Amino acid sequence: TETEFITEVVNQVNALCESGRIAAITAGLDTGNQEGCIDNVTLLVKVGSGQDDKSGPYYPHKADGAGQWELFGKKVAAYNVIPSTRLWIEENGMAYDWGYTTISHELLHSLGAPDLYRTTGDLGEPVGIWDHMAAVSAPANYPLVYTRKDLGWIPEADTPVVTQSGDYTLVP
């Protein structure tokens, strides 16, 4: 199960730290509002073809640790699982580096961004290719103002709202 997998990884990392084989990370782990928790841990997992579907624990996703595990003396608040099969993709004989885009998509979930694609029913594309949370693509798209505002990166006052029909000029 996923819980057993995460427990095993955390136990092995802690054992390596205790034995001195790797150094514990002691700074910069609690930069959010989790008070004493590691805000996010990203696990890159080597898996074979077919082991990365949604029926198992190794598909790309964000999950809450809820303080269930302790790493470097701090509880884990959230974690991302990224299977090795999603780091590169081959299409039409070309290999594309998707690692950074998959990792950043899942990290944005840890920061609070929702998916902006449909998973059930009408599979339309609510925001198309225009937001990183709408699709994992190479190159990665930048989050829309909606997502950045939702994450608190843009103050509410800096986001104008159009309330009337008309012609508007967008200034880059």
Language-model features, listed with the residues they occupy:
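Aromatic-acidic/polar surface patches that form glycan- and anion
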Residues: 2, 36, 96-97
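Extracellular hydrolytic enzyme modules, especially secreted metalloproteases
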Residues: 40, 46-172
